[in-house]
UniProtKB/Swiss-Prot annotation:
Residues 1-22, 70-77, 143-171 are cytoplasmic. Belongs to the Casparian strip membrane proteins (CASP) family. Homodimer and heterodimers. Keywords: Cell membrane, Membrane, Transmembrane, Transmembrane helix. GO terms for cellular component: plasma membrane. It comes from the Eukaryota. This is CASP-like protein 0U2. Its main location: membrane. The keyword Glycoprotein does not apply. It comes from Chlorokybus atmophyticus (Soil alga). It is found in: Cell membrane. The chain crosses the membrane at residues 23-42, 49-69, 78-98, 122-142. Residues 43-48, 99-121 are extracellular. It is a multi-pass membrane protein.
Length: 171
């Protein structure tokens, strides 16, 4: 009888214990909090960029986490490295935009855009944590790129007979 639904999926539960998965999950949480805290502040264009960037990165992280859990083949480390460097650069821009906009004076010289508002400041803090997460992911990808694992460390098949030596004593 065929199996349908979630039981038919072969999830890679070992992926949960890898540092890359954990840092990607932290990146997922930080991007979720960054855009959701800033979503109600649409009167400033800089805040709109933070929301859009956070939404895009949250969606990509969600997709990548599911990809890892569903036994997707690993991406090339050089691709991961440069993607994380680019995303980290955009996270730095979000951090600068959110911080500078919150600190900008409006009206009276003493009144700041975010005076009395905690959500944009918290969003800037999560943008910093997101930047740190992308730095960690870039480091992990760079380390894999520069020191690739040996071919023997890859499990090519789950079949124990396939793992037998090529030469045999059977005649």
């Amino acid at each position: 009888m065929p199996v349908f639904g979630l039981a038919a999926l072969k999830l890679n539960w070992e992926a949960l214990s890898t540092p890359k998965f954990r840092v990607t999950f932290a990146q997922w949480v930080c991007s979720l909090l960054m855009w959701s805290l800033m979503a109600s502040y649409s009167k400033h264009g800089e805040f709109k960029f933070v929301v859009v960037f956070g939404l895009v990165m949250w969606g990509l992280a969600s997709t990548y986490l599911v990809y890892q859990l569903l036994n997707g083949p690993p991406l090339a480390p050089i691709v991961e490295f440069w993607a994380n460097v680019a995303a980290g650069s955009l996270a730095f821009i979000c951090l600068v935009l959110a911080s500078a906009t919150c600190n900008r004076a409006v009206g009276e010289p003493q009144t700041k855009v975010c005076s009395g508002e905690l959500k944009p400041k918290a969003s800037a803090a999560f943008a910093f944590l997101l930047l740190c997460a992308y730095g960690g992911l870039a480091y992990l990808s760079w380390r894999t790129w520069r020191n690739p694992p040996t071919i023997a460390s890859y499990a090519l098949h789950d079949d124990p007979e396939f793992a037998q030596p090529l030469h045999s004593s059977h005649k």
